Amino acid sequence: NLMSLVTLLEQMKAHKVHNIVFSSSCTVYGQPTPEHLPVDETAPIQVALSPYGNTKQINEEIIRDEAHADKSLQATILRYFNPIGAHPSAMIGELPNGVPQNLLPFVTQTAIGLRKELKVFGNDYNTPDGSCIRDYIYVVDLAKAHVKAVERMLSGTALDQVEVFNLGT
């Protein structure tokens, strides 16, 4: 994740490309404090809970540093909250052959009878029943958000040189 972003930014500079939409993650928020729930873009970045989250934090910092050094760089950072689903064409999104990597395919496989039961793990979350609460975004909405981010940069209506948007429910 890190070196590929640095290489991309170097190539953008070499070829005079000044706009980037970066796919980040809600994992940059770490474990949000209760006063910052629900999480919005003003919530502080906390210690990442995974190496993946840490790389996203570092990537965002690299983008901010590069924008500070190069005033022609315009960046939009999109922080995803659990992308789910697939486009009807199956060109984007999940097509879980084998063991899915997240909960929703298990839910749908159970609903149509491919699985006998649905097991949800974890009962010690800070919620009334101890279960996990998750935010999701449909992959088609995610694709539309990328288009909107590019349109916003190209139209000159961005409010800051680096803008951040959360994408979830």
Question: How would you describe each model-predicted region?
Answer:
Residues 7, 168-169:
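Structural/interface elements that position substrates and couple domains in central-metabolism enzymes
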Residues 41, 47, 132-135, 160:
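Residues at the N-terminus of a long alpha-helix
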Residues 25:
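Residue(s) in the substrate-gating loop at a strand-loop-helix junction
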Residues 3-7, 14, 18-19, 28-82, ...:
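Catalytic helix-loop patch of NAD(P)-dependent Rossmann-fold dehydrogenases
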Residues 6-10, 141-144:
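Conserved mid-core alpha-helix of short-chain dehydrogenase/reductase
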Residues 83-86, 105-127, 134-164:
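Alpha-helical substrate-binding/gating segment
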